[in-house]
Amino acid sequence: MSPQPNDEQSQVIQWIESTLGARVVACERQARWRPAWFLVAERGPERLALYFRGDRGLQQGGQYALEHEYRILELLGQAGIPVPTLYGFCDSPRGILMEQVPGRANLATATDENERASVQDHYMQILADIHALDTEPFESAGLVRPTSKSQMALADFPIWERGYAQAKARPDALLAFVSQWLHRNVPETDAAPSFVCADSGQFLFDQGRVTAVIDLELAHLGDPAADLAGLRTRDLSEPLGDLRRATQRYSELRGITLDPRLIDYHTVRFSIVTPLAIAPILHRPPPETDWVQYLCWYWVYARAALEVMAHMTRMTLDPPKPIEATLSPYSAGY
């Protein structure tokens, strides 16, 4: 481990050693699109397993500052929700230093159906606990409390719309169609605003239990039904098991009856956020962008939004025809 002095990894290591008064003895870059590292540091006899979560930046479609997630993690930890312990916030390079929690992501990797069901039950209990939290500490930290049915339904969608409008390189009829539909079909709800994870269903687990809730950068105050919708979108990439069972479990824990049309509406809203965020990247890709990966994300979540809209309006869609592969100089890469 001998990074160059001006290398980003070297800066991270130097900051950690200075902040913790420790010596970093191992460092591994996480294989993902945002900068992140797994590290081990020694401080006297103590051995610290660490994780540095770097800033995704606006170029990757982000709309929330990383400080937002740091404050969220602080407040959830204080409230007894299982989240990683925080060690500090680094200004350059920007990132959150936290505990490397034991466990793994992706419930599809559970050892068997019993473990999958046990973890799912535990997560739904945690989600119910999160939705029952007092919102005042989050409001004091800067989260905006919705005061109208439109704000409850649309949540942070206007933020994503503005970001898309500022960055878009060309018109996109699909995005315009879904956005207009969402504004025209704002649903009624009797739910009180709650803290919602937004991109729910992200956690680490071990031996049948959730060890930490993670990836809370999109969290806000809004309709708790939004987190049931978030489980659906997460399930597209990381299968979460029987979501009907999970939703029933949540209803029992909270003692409420969920309106499936509310969950459907939030599924459309949250699904289309991904295409809104990455369309400008697809149209003007920065160097080294995995363009095909972004294109896949665009169509997976755009299709999800359209299919749920069709379900809500009782329309029957023709199944898409398989696309024949076409050879090109780039085929070998994919």
Which ranges hold each PLM region?
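All-alpha amphipathic helical-bundle segments outside canonical DNA-binding/catalytic cores
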Residues: 87, 258-269
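Active-site activation/catalytic loop segments of kinase-like enzymes and analogous catalytic loops
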Residues: 225-258, 269-288, 303-312
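Active-site acidic catalytic loop and adjacent metal/ATP-binding pocket
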Residues: 32-41, 47-52, 86, 94, ...
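An alpha-helical support segment within catalytic cores of ATP-dependent transferases
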Residues: 8-23, 133-197, 207, 255-258, ...
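ATP-binding pocket architecture of kinase catalytic cores
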Residues: 28-155, 159-173
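Residues at helix-coil transition
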Residues: 21, 78, 102-103, 125-128, ...
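Generic recognition of well-ordered alpha-helical segments
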Residues: 14, 68-71, 125, 177-180, ...
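ATP/Mg2+ or Mg2+-diphosphate-binding catalytic cores
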Residues: 276-334
